């Protein structure tokens, strides 16, 4: 998300819900809202100080993003897993009907691909050549109940999307922000060639923090003060250039 908002997407100065003549981003796995809100604030959509209200009573920053409070940068209520593909595809179709040279981006968790609605949209997008669409899969093999392969193994995602007719890009170093920028630029340059694009981004949950790496147990758990200090010391600022 950092790379998309700071380096890739064409964005208008003022936020509007319809996003006319600009690129759009939709977050499907809405439970990663802290990351989304942080990026939006640092991209000028609302004051950074508002991040301190996260999940508090009457805050605009709830656990799952919602349009109810009119938070700039949020266009859909997300977190009902599996709906993001359908929303992004619909927005991409709208851009094409309006003859805009704009791209729709979306982010999805690998676990939510277990929802059948995804695959109806994936099939539709390829069959109808929705080629102004770039979808990224956060492929970390973790979901709330455990490892993806143990809960419901999705097999080889590259082969699946290829079979459905998508242009498939793979990134092994999904935690390397420079590599992320390269693959997103590659995807952007491949748009408008009669195929939707998917990036299978292999990542590690909790990367850089020794007690959070490689486990699903931090999926919905907040660190205490001691754990927070330790995590911040192990994982210092890495995006200052963005």
Give each language-model segment a name:
Residues 31-32, 140-141, 202-206:
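Glycine-rich beta-alpha junction loops
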Residues 24, 103, 132, 196-198:
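Beta-sheet entry/capping signal
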Residues 177, 181-242:
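Glycine/aspartate-rich loop-and-adjacent alpha/beta segment that forms the canonical ThDP
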Residues 2-127:
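Cofactor-binding active-site loop characterized by glycine-rich and histidine/acidic residues
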Residues 29, 33, 47, 84, ...:
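Generic structural signal for well-ordered, non-membrane alpha-helical segments
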Residues 43, 151, 213-217:
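Short secondary-structure boundary/capping segments
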Residues 73, 77-80, 85-191:
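Thiamine diphosphate
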